[in-house]
């Protein structure tokens, strides 16, 4: 409701009210001349009312009578400060002394009369405005109160609560009481703090899930489990057959068995249920899911079967190792350890050879145990075939197993049926096992040397090709050098073939680790999108250059950018192109301007030669344009940088122009002043020689004018004009003669003139300097015809000077 009321109560500014009142007073004075005395008295009354208002003004409250509020509001409306006074304490104080409209004579009409302006706002609006002022005042008081509470803190009561007493020194006393509880012990010369049991248990606490592929601690645990498994596989058959377990050493065997059982049990209860697995492409790390997955797997069944305590039968049947045969069922951990170990080794084929050799030795160990059992069954020393009981039992039986499996002759013939059947089975198993191991060994060694065999095959094919086409020996030597260096440095011929089998994300990760630090240093690519640089890393190609190979030659069109990965290159220059200007090392970049240059700016400006073996990364122009299609912001940045680099390149090229032919006989000229360049640019078709001649003639003319007077100066000017006209005619005739001699039309030469005088820079070219040196100083009857023709060699021209006699006039 207040909003609608305040919108109606619009008050005009004070200045406008004053102007209206003054105009109304003038009208009244015009109609009533006797009102001047009344006007002065009215002004005095207004001043008196203003003083009384200033002394009696008080803040408006909700308890004031309505009559007082209405009187104050009427005065405020007359002063024009109803809704613009922000001070809540002086809400009823007027800011002007303009007389109220009510005091005017109702019979008088003026600009502010009721007929000329809308009717005044009703009293209810004034009351609402006063209420709004009161509301603003209370809101400000409330804001100040809450601000004070925020600064001083929220108090529960208006009375200040007593300050809380400072904490006593009880906690330090407790800390001092706890300090003596810490225990220390000395280790040699060091004082070591004894860790509490709870802290130690926290540190050795197992994680909720274990990544079997990346966790190295899990790999160490698998090594411990594998050792326990190998102990059982080797010594259970040995203790079962050979008489090595006796009553004197039985307690040692039992201790070793208990340790192995503890390792098995701990692995089954605490390690295997925490291994992560993949289901539907997601890695499962939830503890409940991990335990459920392990309990439903075949590995859990084998682990339970391997830990069944058949050792209890020792109480009824004695210490027979046969009851521990189920410990050999935990073979899954053994193969898992082999798989993880091969995945982290640099040369896994070495471990594969060792593992295959271990398989062979273990089979021979089992065969030796079986042979001793057969000899004991037949009776030791009863026949020539069985073990005779002499020497070390295990070594003699192992020797017999080696000769049997490898099918070495010279063994005693079996005598009984049991011996014959046993020997036949032994021969068959020996041939099968031995051939399998030999084949596996061949595969391991073949896989280890597969890359080298491929390298040898490629090199042999290339040499055969070169011999077939009678390639020179020097070229063949360079080809062999490239093959040998590539193999020695990379152990492969083309590393891109290896990366093709990997996914794009893995290729990008490898490229970032190898080449990102190099390409991020290129000034041309600084400020570009990082993703664009990542895309370029995937497109880089590695190229190997031999010592003395030209990476790029001067004058050829540049289509690639080069980044030095390994080695050095030299930039050659000078008159003969053999001077080393600079040597670029690993991490340097060259040729980047050619990627973005256009209109002839992409030509190579120098020869670049590999100083030694140089491995360079290349990026061609086409590939860069394909990448920039998706990165318009980076393209704008690259284009801007390319223009700056091209300008710098043009300045350096202008600073050292090439000197050819007759220009080599004269010293290089100084740089042309800017003022002279401006003058030369505005002369149109005038040549440099003509300007110099005019300058000398003007100097001579000034000297003659100072000596001979003004008349002689005028005559000299006329003569000078005549000489210039004659010189123009002679030049035109000489050009016509030149065109006739060369069989050209006289219209071809003027077409070439605008090209020579198109810009002031053309004045600095060498042909003009040569023309200046050979022009005659005085008048002669000889004319010089100078022409330039392209040479057979790229980047060179042939200067031709012909001398002809002028015709006599």
UniProtKB/Swiss-Prot annotation:
A Pfam family matched in the record: Ion_trans
Region listing for Selectivity filter, in residue ranges: 407-410
MF (Gene Ontology): cGMP binding; intracellularly cAMP-activated cation channel activity; intracellularly cGMP-activated cation channel activity; protein-containing complex binding
Disordered: annotated segments: 1-121, 153-178, 698-776
UniProt-annotated binding residues for 3',5'-cyclic GMP: 591-592, 604-605
Side Extracellular, residues: 243-249, 318-320, 372-393
Source organism superkingdom: Eukaryota
Subcellular location: Cell membrane
Tissue expression summary: Expressed specifically in the retina.
Site (Occludes the pore below the central gate): 442
Marked site (Central gate) residue numbers: 434, 438
Membrane-crossing residue ranges in chain numbering: 219-242, 250-270, 300-317, 321-335, 349-371, 394-420, 421-445
Swiss-Prot/TrEMBL domain comment: The cyclic nucleotide-binding domain (CNBD) comprises three helices and a beta-roll of eight beta-strands from CNGA3 and CNGB3 subunits. Upon cNMP binding transmits the conformational changes to the C-linker domain of the S6 helix to open the ion conduction pathway. The ion conduction pathway consists of S5, S6 and pore helices from CNGA3 and CNGB3 subunits. It contains a central hydrophobic gate that opens upon cNMP binding. CNGB1 displays an additional charged arginine gate below the central gate to regulate ion permeation.
Subunit comment: Forms heterotetrameric channels composed of CNGA3 and CNGB3 subunits with 3:1 stoichiometry.
Protein name: Cyclic nucleotide-gated channel beta-3
Species, as recorded: Homo sapiens (Human)
Gene responsible for this protein: CNGB3
